[in-house]
Swiss-Prot record:
This is AP-1 complex subunit mu. Component of the adapter complexes which link clathrin to receptors in coated vesicles. Clathrin-associated protein complexes are believed to interact with the cytoplasmic tails of membrane proteins, leading to their selection and concentration. AP47 is a subunit of the plasma membrane adapter. GO terms for biological process: intracellular protein transport; vesicle-mediated transport. Residues 176-417 form the MHD domain. Regulated by phosphorylation. GO terms for cellular component: clathrin adaptor complex; clathrin-coated vesicle membrane; Golgi apparatus. Adaptor protein complex 1 (AP-1) is a heterotetramer composed of two large adaptins (gamma- and beta'-type subunits), a medium adaptin (mu-type subunit AP47) and a small adaptin (sigma-type subunit AP19). It is found in: Golgi apparatus; Cytoplasmic vesicle, Clathrin-coated vesicle membrane. Pfam families: Adap_comp_sub, Clat_adaptor_s. Belongs to the adaptor complexes medium subunit family. It comes from Diplobatis ommata.
Length: 418
């Protein structure tokens, strides 16, 4: 299965390595580094690379490349899923998954990797079990361990390992019983010059924070579950109930976890929450051009569009730009030719506008194509797909928990062609 694991930072340097079967030289990561340089961005590299003697399976999370080295063919998705589990476990343990946090807790990281893989095969990947095996770091525990010479390794067998519900331990108790759900939707879209939608889809996730005493059995229902495509669930979800009734029935893990992810690819179900009016043109003699952009809300159900950022890669012949912003701040880098307009939030009735002159390099031909607008935004308390949580029912326990749902819509790869 997995022979070695390497963690690389943004500069391509290996700052952590772990070997299970045989020691593989870190020089094997040079193949991945070369592929990253060719691709421009680490996210654009193919997840599986073949080298003369190994296969490299990698994923990029939190600015870190997680690289698994294997020698025989195995299902790539199996390895990729394990790498994501490693990243999520480090995030859960240390609050962030960064080079600094990993180096500060390097002993715990090695203890976790030792438990998560047994001779290269996944063994314990559930956060609930790992936290019983390896105690999460705290300031007090670190001080006690340094004085007594003890470690974070637990001295008892995890209770969840022996049950048919490995993601939840027995005897869980909370003073305040609460269940919160975050519905986050990311919209990817391409809008053409006329404002028509060329492509649009939604990637959504439902993250849960469950702190309930005992062994509760939860049922989460939706008002319109039929709009969801390509769903994937946490192992706790009873898939047959979803297939027959379109409800989520599950005994939850303790704490934070991703309950499900889903996809909406029907364009008539994807409401575009912003519109853009644009007028970008260049004179035929190639001396100057005119730039005029206005952004406004559309189909936002009265919610405020926040954190709006417009990024435009201008043509190479652009020398500088003389612009005026009715709202927000803008910067133009004459070296990279990147214009960034930070709008913030749209405060009606006035719409944010950016307009002015474009100065081109003398003697150069008129640009053949207009630039594309890359737009980022965020809308609180709105699921752009129309997904709504109906109710949450609890069985098996007698107390009444606090319940809450939060919705967020944000832009993914949102482009407007001019």
């Amino acid at each position: 299965m997995i022979h070695s694991l390497f963690l690389m930072n943004g500069g391509g340097a290996v700052f952590l390595e772990k070997h299970w079967r045989s020691v593989v030289s870190r020089s094997v990561c040079a193949y991945l580094l070369e592929a990253q340089l060719k691709a421009g961005q680490p996210e654009n590299v193919a997840p599986v690379l073949a080298t003369p003697h190994h296969y490299l399976v990698s994923t990029h999370r939190h600015g870190i490349s997680f690289v698994a080295v294997i020698q025989a063919e195995v299902p790539p998705l199996f390895v990729i899923e394990f790498l994501h589990r490693v990243a999520e476990t480090l995030q859960d343990y240390f609050g962030e998954c960064s080079e600094a946090s990993i180096k500060d807790n390097v002993v715990i990281v090695y203890e976790l990797l030792e438990e998560m893989l047994d001779n290269g095969f996944p063994l314990a990947t559930e956060s609930n079990i790992l936290k019983e095996l390896i105690k999460p770091p705290t300031i007090l525990r670190s001080v006690v361990n340094s004085i007594t010479g003890s470690s974070n390794v637990g001295d008892q067998l995890p209770t969840g390992q022996l049950s048919n519900i490995p993601w939840r331990r027995v005897g869980v108790k909370y003073t305040n019983n609460e269940a919160y759900f975050d519905v986050t939707e990311e919209i990817d879209a391409i809008i053409d010059k006329s404002g028509s939608t060329v492509f649009a889809e939604i990637q959504g996730v439902i993250d849960a924070c469950i702190k309930l005493t005992g062994m509760p059995d939860l049922t989460l229902s939706f008002l319109n579950p039929r709009l969801l495509d390509d769903v994937s669930f946490h192992p706790c979800v009873r898939f047959k109930r979803w297939e027959s009734e379109r409800v989520l029935s599950f005994i939850p893990p303790v704490g934070n976890f991703r309950l499900m992810s889903y996809h909406v690819n029907s364009q008539n179900l994807v409401a575009i929450p912003v519109y853009v009016k644009h007028n970008i043109n260049f004179r035929d003699d190639g001396s100057t051009g005119w730039f005029d952009i206005t952004i406004g809300p559309k189909q936002t159900m009265g919610k405020v569009v926040e954190n709006i950022l417009v990024i435009i890669h201008m043509p190479k012949v652009v020398l500088n730009m003389t612009l005026t912003a009715a709202q927000g701040n803008f910067t133009f880098d004459p070296v990279t030719k990147v214009l960034i307009w930070d709008i913030g939030k749209i405060i009606l009735p006035k719409l944010p506008t950016l307009k002015g002159l474009i100065n081109l390099q003398s003697g150069e031909a008129k640009p053949e194509e207009n630039p594309t607008l890359n737009i980022q935004f965020r809308i609180q308390q709105l699921a752009v797909s129309g997904l709504k949580v109906n109710r949450l029912d609890m069985y098996g326990e007698r107390y009444k928990p606090f319940k809450g749902v939060k919705y967020v819509t944000k832009a993914g790869k949102f482009q407007v062609r001019t």
